[in-house]
């Protein structure tokens, strides 16, 4: 999949046009949604990372990246990276993401995230992903380099998009 993803608003329109049943059927895989980027740590002060949504995200804010290979056991890992490379399944065009940054896979019915030895690291809810894969349930904040994303299961994504539609009425 290339880096030309769709945005949350596109999915909200699609849900309104298709109805929930058809939308659920069509979107049966988990997704990553860009929610911002980590601010650089201040040299003085608390040193706490914060998430910003400045326009420096170059069109990535609220972009949705489906993870279709994560929908079924035994499908093999889905590789996330920044460049078109052999074996990269989902391309996120952000300089702080490595060419082959991380993988998502299904293991014993659980979605797990592993770092591929990326230069700028991977974290889940602020905790670095070490050598052991991290289990995901949905709703986690994932940092890939400086980019902040949320991981949503397919049902969680449908619920999120549905809540957007309800709020906009």
Map each language-model feature to its residues:
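Catalytic Cys-His active-site segments of thiol-dependent hydrolases/isopeptidases
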Residues: 80-82, 113-117, 143
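Short linear Ser/Thr-Pro motifs
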Residues: 86, 96-98, 118
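Intrinsically disordered, low-complexity acidic Ser/Thr-rich regulatory segments
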Residues: 1-92, 156-169
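Buried hydrophobic-core signal for structured, non-transmembrane domains
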Residues: 102-104
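C-terminal boundary/linker segments immediately following FHA domains
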Residues: 1, 106, 117, 123-169
């Amino acid at each position: 999949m290339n880096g030309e993803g769709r945005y949350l608003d596109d999915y909200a329109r699609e849900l309104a046009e298709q109805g929930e049943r058809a939308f659920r059927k069509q979107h049966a895989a988990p997704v990553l949604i860009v929610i911002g980027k980590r601010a650089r740590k201040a040299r003085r002060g608390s040193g706490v990372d914060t998430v910003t949504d400045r326009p420096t995200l170059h069109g990535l804010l609220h972009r949705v990246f489906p993870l279709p290979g994560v929908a079924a056991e035994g499908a093999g890992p889905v590789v996330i990276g920044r460049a078109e490379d052999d074996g990269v399944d989902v391309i996120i065009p952000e300089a702080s993401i490595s060419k082959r940054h991380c993988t998502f896979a299904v293991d014993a019915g659980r979605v797990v995230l592993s770092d591929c030895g990326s230069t700028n690291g991977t974290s889940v809810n602020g905790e670095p992903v070490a050598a052991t894969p991290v289990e995901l349930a949905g709703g986690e904040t994932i940092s890939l380099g400086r980019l902040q994303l949320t991981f949503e299961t397919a049902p969680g994504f449908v619920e999120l998009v549905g809540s957007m539609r309800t709020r906009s009425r």
